């Protein structure tokens, strides 16, 4: 069972997608995201398996919520630096978590 101390280890922040493109090299369909997390964290990239509901062009300027303190992972040669969070209503289906009102990039989630 997880305890509050486990949750407090996560650095969860808001960011704005500034670039998105298809990622055909990925084993599972995905989109490469470039996300602005503000001056403290900066620009980070992520591979997100969100192709069932989203197209790259529709993601630009969308705010998302991500864990920013996991170690980077290499996915088909691409360095994924953050884990973008979403709800999973079904197999292969992800709905991005977003603030319901705009907040500054880098805002902590707790």
Swiss-Prot record:
It is found in: Cytoplasm. PROSITE patterns: TRBD. Disruption phenotype: Grows normally, reduced secretion of SdpC (formerly YvaY) and another 36 kDa protein. One of its GO terms (molecular function) is tRNA binding. Coiled coil: none annotated. Can suppress growth and secretion defects in E.coli secA and secB mutants. Probably a molecular chaperone for exported proteins or may act by stabilizing the SecA protein. PANTHER family: TRNA-AMINOACYLATION COFACTOR ARC1 FAMILY MEMBER (PTHR11586), TRNA-BINDING DOMAIN-CONTAINING PROTEIN (PTHR11586:SF37). This is Probable chaperone CsaA. It comes from Bacillus subtilis (strain 168).
